Structure formats: structure tokens, C-alpha cells
Swiss-Prot record:
HAMAP family: Gly_tRNA_synth_beta. Tetramer of two alpha and two beta subunits. This is Glycine--tRNA ligase beta subunit. Disulfide bonds: none annotated. Its EC number is 6.1.1.14. Pfam families: DALR_1, tRNA_synt_2f. It comes from Shigella boydii serotype 18 (strain CDC 3083-94 / BS512).
Length: 689
């Protein structure tokens, strides 16, 4: 069977840049599924994406499905015919479904009986006939949160569609996709190359688009070119470009023919905190800032034009004129804000609502101030500095700079605090209170900052759970999942001596009578333990290891982490599987018994050598391991407990627990309970698979 290259290009108006990659990848994934479901042999499915097009190119696509033999078994003969030999309704219905009459059916005989059988040779459909529906289905399944409708048609897509190119080899596949009749026409760059041209063969793509249309269709190629050219441009002016992955992706999604240029701004603007300038350049203008080797911002920026100009200086000057007013605004706001102290913004916090039932930002500030001081006392941080940081924590939200450039919250608080002469760890805490902002983000760097960051997040968790507005499904408007994971990361990775129970209780207490959820403390802790589950799964821990630790509900995050590492190590020991099974057996035996057990094992009642040996080792280990448990040395404790494998195995091989002698039975049950309690001091290893 011959093979050909298939090309589908959907020509659109400008697609959302932040969604371009996901749209293209999903298109390719969806179409691959369609090909496989149809049984069409194919080679690589390659995707291309540019601002005004989504394209797939499929190599070595079979021209038709393979022929196949099908068999459909019908009713058993006993049910297929009545006593007179006439076909039953079941047999007739089955035959209609197969497109035959009952008398045309074959018979299938096995050692289990005889059935009606339909056999047929099905000729594979041509690829040409299948492709239109496969393309339409793949497009319909794209992850588009908001569809558009254009013109008078009822067609919906992410953006209006102007061209649809469907080529199998050199042949146009006739179809109407998204309201457009397929053709071999492709549109080029808006301002360079040929605005529109025809493509003779699918194999010509994407080279023909580059040569005639001045469009680089390959997304990764454009991105790599921007990165390489920007690095070279920065090197020429003695700096390093800030090429963040997210901005690189966005810029690559905005241009069809990237041309990297370098521009500058007045050095006087460098007196403004670099973060504000960078926010303007990256967030508003999609420029790449440039830093000197010492990390200081240079008065230059790199940008990407979407056209090759005969006079690039004109484009450079235009971009410099665009950014200058924004930088001047930042300079004005910075100078204006510094005319008063950061603390002077406190009264204005009373005018901004945090949440209707939970009060204003000033109310939140007062709670954070108190909670940060309490946390500082627990972890050995400077209490005065922590409470001061709490008091100032939201003041920068009332400044002109943060009002205009919202992403500078925190960092501007730090700069204004330094200007006011606040302690350095207080100033740093104002900047780091929102960390970690995302997975893998840096944690607060000093104890005061840790106290403030935890206080801010715990206040939000306690308040929102306290009024019953916990996250539901994918909806998490107050970012509580991120807040909970942030608290856990800070406590675990900084090894802070904090207990979620007392921490949550203190956060709840500071709300007074504002909260309506009587179970708020337990709800917050359960939610945070659930975040632990997600965190450790992402770290590669098995679900049963996590369950074993969660069963003990440890509320000290650092302690939880130590238990996780201990159980994970325990699983590598030779004795682990046997002891996990033994614990499960012990758990089941104890669960089935409703008898009241003694506080201690009566050694004089023991009879069998195996139970005597096990009882002695349990007593010895109980005393030996007490310091281990007190110090959180759970891994060492489980290594010691692994030595119980042989006596435990011997006990269950030789000793009957549920004997008729009540005293003996209760004594043996008590011994098993004491054995299980030793393991439960770390985790419920009976849950290990």
C-alpha cells in the first residue's frame, strides 16, 4: 500500500499567544488518536504553530485502511429458534444489525455449544474519505476556554478562520472545515513575502512558507532563533539578557519572522528599583531586560520585531518612545511614594476589603502582626521584627507604584522600608512574604520572613475555611492550595518547630467571632495533609507509603517529612514485606477481637518458646526505641524494628493466638497490640503493599 504526506493548515487571525503551544500540541495529539483509532498506518505527526496558523504534517500516511475480517457471534442456537424452527426475535434483531437474514448466518460450534455467526470481509475505507471528519473532530476537541463566532455563520473557533489547506500528497482533499472550503492556498506574512500563494505538494511545507511567505512555521525554531539572537545582542553590549522561559514562549507566539533588535533608555531611570523597570519592560512591552555581569540592570533592552526593516533604527526609536513614558511613570510614582513613610499607609488599608465576612486589609494586617509574632516566638526569630513586618506587610498595596504595577507588591514594600530605615530583616520579609509563589520558587531567606510568610498564608487559610469557602473542584479563587503547600514547604525545608494543630488554632483564635465553621481547625489541617499527599506523590513517593504516614495524622510537618523518609527507607529492607504483612495480620486479629486487653504482657502466662522470645524482644525494643521516637529518629527505629522479622514469623508459625484459654488468649493479644504499637509510633506499615 502506497504512502503519502498529509498536510493540514488552519489559517486564522492572530491566535492567543499564551495558548498557541498548547493548541498546536493538542491538535497533534488529537489527530494522532484519530489516526490510530481509524487503523491508518502513519509516520511522525509534526506540528507547526505561528500567530496566524495551526498546522500538522503527517509522514508516510497510508492511502487506505487495511482490509479486515470481522466476526460477530449471535444468540445460541437454543435461543435463536423456537420449537418450530422459526427464528426468534433475538435472532432476527441480531441479523438485522449485521445486515443479513438469519438464514444467511453461519454456525459456530465449540465444546460449550453452538451459536449463530456472521463473518464478513470489510474493505478498508480510503484515507481521503476519512480525513475531513478526523480533522474536524481533532479541532473540536482543542482546549479552548472561550470560543468566538464571526460573520453570519454559526461556526465557533478560538479565532476567525480564513483558509483551510488539506493536501494528501499533491491532491486537495475536498472538505468544509470550520465553514471554509479546503484548498491549496496558504497566506504568507502580512507585510513581507507573498501575501497568498498555492502549495503543490504537502512535502513542500514548511520550506515553501519560509521562502515565499516569509513565515517560520516551526515554533521551536523561532524560539531558538530569538534566544540565540538575543544572547548575541546582549553580549555585544557587555550584558546578559533576561530570557525567562515564559516570556520567550510568549514572544515566539507573537511573531512569524523574528528580528531581534537592541534599544536603550535614559540612565536616570536606573534610580528606580529594577523590579519596577523590569515589570514594565517584560509585562507591558514584552521586552527582554539586560543585566551587567555584576547583576545590575543596564539601560538597555532587547525586543523582537516581526518584520525585516530597511531602516531598523526607526523601529528601535519607536520602541524607545513607547517605553519612555512608562518608565517616567515608574520614576514619578517611586519619588511620590517616598515622600511619606510606609507606615503612613496603614489607615488607608481600612478602606479596602479583604473579604466581606472577614473584614478589611487593616483587619488582616492586625491578625498577621499578632500571628507573625507568635510564630517568631515558636521558631526563635526576632519577635519585635516579626510583629513590625506584620504591621507593614500590606502597606505597599496602597502606594502609587503597586497600584499601577501590581506585580511589584512586596518588593516595593522592601524598598520603601529600607528608605524609611527599617531593620533589614523586616524589609526583606516584606518582599519575601508571598514566597513561594509557585512550585520550585525560592523560600523566605530569614526567620522573620518565614514567620511573616507563614502568618499571611495561615490567616487566609483559617479565614476562608472558617466561612466555608474551601476550594471546590478546579476552583480556588483564594489560591488556598498554593498557600497550604507554601506553609508546608517553609516548615519542612527550613526545619521549623511548628505544629499545624497549634498554628491553626492560633490563626483561628485571632478571628474572634467572625468565623462560622465550627470544624475549621480540623478542616484546615485535613486540607494541608492532603497537600502533603500531592507534594510527596510529585516527589516520587508511593501512594501506600504516604497513606501509611497519613494514617498516624502527624501534625508537625518536619516530623511528617522524617516519617516519610523513614518508611521509604524501611521499604528497601529485606524484612519490610514480611513485617508489613505481619502488621496487617495483627491489625486484622485485633480488629476482630472485642475483648478488653491488659496494659502489659504477663510474662508468667507465656508458654511457647516463640512467644517468650518475641515478648522479650518487644519489651527490650520498647525501652531502647523510646529515645529514638522522642528525637524523631524514625529511620533508625524502623531499622531496629526490622530485626523482629524472624521472631514474628516464628510466632505466627508455631503459636495459636485465639486459643480457648482466655487468660492465655488475652495475653497473646496484648503482646500483639504492644508489637503493633511500636510500629505505629512511626507509621501504619500494614498499609504497605
Amino acid at each position: 500500500m502506497s504512502e503519502k504526506t498529509f498536510l493540514v493548515e488552519i489559517g486564522t487571525e492572530e491566535l492567543p499567544p499564551k495558548a498557541l503551544r498548547s493548541l498546536a500540541e493538542s491538535f497533534a495529539a488529537n489527530f494522532t488518536v484519530e489516526l490510530d483509532n481509524a487503523g491508518l498506518a502513519h509516520g511522525t505527526v509534526q506540528w507547526f504553530a505561528a500567530p496566524r496558523r495551526l498546522t500538522l504534517k503527517v509522514a508516510n500516511l497510508a492511502e487506505a485502511q487495511p482490509d479486515r475480517e470481522i466476526e460477530k457471534r449471535g444468540p445460541a442456537i437454543a435461543q435463536a429458534f423456537d420449537a418450530e424452527g422459526k427464528p426468534s426475535k433475538a435472532a432476527e434483531g441480531w441479523a438485522r444489525g449485521c445486515g443479513i437474514t438469519v438464514d444467511q448466518a453461519e454456525r459456530l460450534t465449540t465444546d460449550k455449544g453452538e451459536w449463530l455467526l456472521y463473518r464478513a470481509h470489510v474493505k478498508g475505507e480510503s484515507t481521503e474519505a476519512l480525513l475531513p471528519n478526523m480533522v474536524a473532530t481533532s479541532l473540536a476537541k482543542l482546549p479552548i476556554p472561550k470560543l468566538m463566532r464571526w460573520g453570519a455563520s454559526d461556526v465557533h473557533f478560538v479565532r476567525p478562520v480564513h483558509t483551510v489547506t488539506l493536501l494528501l500528497g499533491d491532491k486537495v482533499i475536498p472538505a468544509t472545515i470550520l465553514g471554509i472550503q479546503s484548498d491549496r492556498v496558504i497566506r504568507g506574512h502580512r507585510f513581507m513575502g507573498e501575501p497568498e500563494f498555492t502549495i503543490d505538494n504537502a512535502d513542500q511545507y514548511p520550506e515553501i512558507l519560509r521562502e515565499r511567505g516569509k513565515v517560520i512555521a516551526d515554533y521551536e525554531e523561532r524560539k531558538a532563533k530569538i534566544k540565540a539572537d538575543a544572547e548575541e545582542a546582549a553580549r555585544k553590549i557587555g550584558g546578559n539578557a533576561d530570557l525567562s522561559e515564559s516570556l520567550l514562549e510568549e514572544v515566539a507566539s507573537l511573531v512569524e519572522w523574528p528580528v531581534v533588535l537592541t534599544a536603550k533608555f535614559e540612565e536616570k531611570f536606573l534610580a528606580v528599583p529594577a523590579e519596577a523597570l523590569v515589570y514594565t519592560m517584560k509585562g507591558d512591552q514584552k521586552y527582554f531586560p539586560v543585566y551587567a555581569n555584576d547583576g545590575k540592570l543596564l539601560p538597555n533592552f532587547i525586543f523582537v520585531a516581526n518584520i525585516e526593516s530597511k531602516d531598523p533604527q526607526q523601529i528601535i526609536s519607536g520602541n524607545e518612545k513607547v517605553v519612555r513614558p512608562r518608565l517616567a511613570d515608574a520614576e514619578f510614582f517611586f519619588n511620590t511614594d517616598r515622600k511619606k513613610r510606609l507606615e503612613d499607609n496603614l489607615p488607608r488599608l481600612q478602606t479596602v476589603l479583604f473579604q466581606q465576612q472577614l473584614g478589611t486589609l487593616r483587619d488582616k494586617t492586625d491578625r498577621i502582626q499578632a500571628l507573625a509574632g507568635w510564630i517568631a516566638e515558636q521558631i526563635g526569630a526576632d519577635v519585635n521584627h516579626a510583629t513590625r513586618a506584620g504591621l507593614l506587610s500590606k502597606c505597599d498595596l496602597m502606594t502609587n507604584m503597586v497600584f499601577e504595577f501590581t506585580d511589584t507588591q512586596g518588593v516595593m514594600g522592601m524598598h520603601y522600608a529600607r528608605h524609611d530605615g527599617e531593620a533589614e530583616d523586616v524589609a526583606v520579609a516584606l518582599n519575601e512574604q508571598y514566597q513561594p509563589r509557585f512550585a520550585g520558587d525560592d523560600l523566605p531567606s530569614n526567620p522573620v520572613a518565614c514567620a511573616l510568610a507563614i502568618a499571611d498564608k495561615m490567616d487566609t487559610l483559617a479565614g476562608i475555611f472558617g466561612i466555608g469557602q474551601h476550594p471546590k473542584g478546579d476552583k480556588d479563587p483564594f489560591a488556598l492550595r498554593r498557600a497550604a503547600l507554601g506553609v508546608l514547604r517553609i516548615i519542612v525545608e527550613k526545619n521549623l518547630n511548628l505544629d499545624l494543630q497549634t498554628l491553626t488554632e492560633e490563626a483561628v483564635r485571632l478571628y474572634g467571632d467572625k468565623l462560622t465553621n465550627a470544624n475549621v481547625v480540623d478542616d484546615v489541617i485535613d486540607f494541608m495533609l492532603g497537600r502533603f499527599r500531592a507534594w510527596y506523590q510529585d516527589e516520587g513517593y508511593t501512594v501506600d507509603t504516604i497513606q501509611a504516614v497519613l494514617a498516624r495524622r502527624p501534625t508537625r510537618p518536619a516530623d511528617f517529612d522524617a516519617r516519610m523518609k523513614a518508611v521509604s527507607h524501611f521499604r528497601t529492607l529485606d524484612a519490610a514485606a514480611a513485617l508489613a504483612a505481619a502488621n496487617k495480620r495483627v491489625s486484622n486479629i485485633l480488629a476482630k477481637s472485642d475483648e478488653v486487653l491488659s496494659d502489659r504482657v504477663n510474662a508468667s502466662t507465656l508458654k511457647e518458646p516463640e512467644e517468650i522470645k518475641l515478648a522479650m524482644q518487644v519489651v527490650v525494643l520498647r525501652d531502647k526505641l523510646e529515645p529514638y521516637f522522642a528525637e524523631g529518629r524514625y529511620q533508625d527505629a524502623l531499622v531496629e524494628l526490622a530485626e523482629l522479622r524472624e521472631p514474628v514469623d516464628a510466632f505466627f508459625d508455631k503459636v495459636m493466638v485465639m486459643v480457648d484459654d482466655k487468660e492465655l488468649r488475652l495475653n497473646r493479644l496484648t503482646m500483639l497490640e504492644k508489637l503493633r504499637e511500636l510500629f505505629l509510633r512511626v507509621a501504619d506499615i500494614s498499609l504497605l503493599q
